[in-house]
């Protein structure tokens, strides 16, 4: 008798399934993209026929952080949090089996459609997201990396929180954290300042995510991330670039999220009672945009396959003609990119590089093959420090990646390096900030001298940031080398 596809969801993998090789339990269908620490694949659970997501993590990655992610997912049982089914060790990879969300992340949908979201769509997504945060915070857990790339949608439109690679749990002995972790543009001021933080740090990130969904990118996305880190704690809370495009309810919701004093910031439970969320429409309003995004993805996949087949045929012809193999750069040639267009208001077009920015900062990007190749070349699988000093700031991976991308183009960037070295020499020592913080001497300078100092301020700060980054890497590299040496010794036993 033919077994019908089960209506009940897969709750957990059986003990029998966990003793088998993962290939016996699952059929892996396709690669979905890159998440924190590893690649994510779509697969089918053979016994039940249920589609799942499998994150394959190299064991060289930071196992402590991966185990933390699994531990957090195991403890969660909510419709608004991605479910965990079990895990396997296979050769040098850890396979983490999770709930599959067929529509991908909110940032994927924005990128594929090349459109920002409407207020109604944002409100519906935020309602589910807040319910997920309310659950996590009730369990005394902080997500710490809330952004559009970590909010996944299933095909029905239900939003679920994902990617607990940097999530942490509050305990009685450690009620507040003082480690900088997460993605720079979404980070709360108290997180950047390392003055200790709690669950409402996620609420600030949710406010930034609201602006991201409305405008296509977070505030400060156009400036250097290190400069944003300086600006977020000192500047007033960010707002919409064109507030007149949005209703008072939405503007007030974002304002309540982006309160700089965490003690005065609203909680997830309080925000669920906000009129903007209380009046949110059902998830059915998201089905059209999900269908549109999935259709675009399917068409691009077909076009990519067609181009790859044509290139394979051409390479075979070239080989026959010249008796030499001709290598084709199929990945870069076949990857679709959204055109650069406007980025204003609801249902407006956005620049592709504003959403692609997130992929460099840890957001999963569906079928972004060319970026995957770059990540494999420079080996920047997300790593947080495992020493007692606390995790490494995730945003530092962004700078490492930028450095590695720039290495093959040293000649192209020669002028930039020359400008940097020139700028280092044009600032007299007496232009540095006085150690005692006494700026009275400025009163004696002429207007022209004050103008020159003001113009020189940004280059001076860039220089200080570069010096700081180099000192950081100089201290970090010996620690990583020592860790790698210990791992190699352990593998030899």
Swiss-Prot record:
Gene3D superfamilies given in the database record: 1.10.287.4270, p53-like tetramerisation domain, Transferase(Phosphotransferase) domain 1
SARAH domain span: 439-486
Main location per the UniProt record: cytoplasm
GO biological process: apoptotic process; hippo signaling; intracellular signal transduction; negative regulation of canonical Wnt signaling pathway; positive regulation of apoptotic process; protein tetramerization; regulation of MAPK cascade
EC number(s) stated in the UniProt entry for this protein: 2.7.11.1
GO MF term list: ATP binding; metal ion binding; protein kinase activity; protein serine kinase activity; protein serine/threonine kinase activity
Keyword match Protein transport: no
Protein's UniProt name: Serine/threonine-protein kinase 3
Subunit structure comment from the entry: Homodimer; mediated via the coiled-coil region.
Site (described: Cleavage): 321-322
Subcellular localization: Cytoplasm; Nucleus
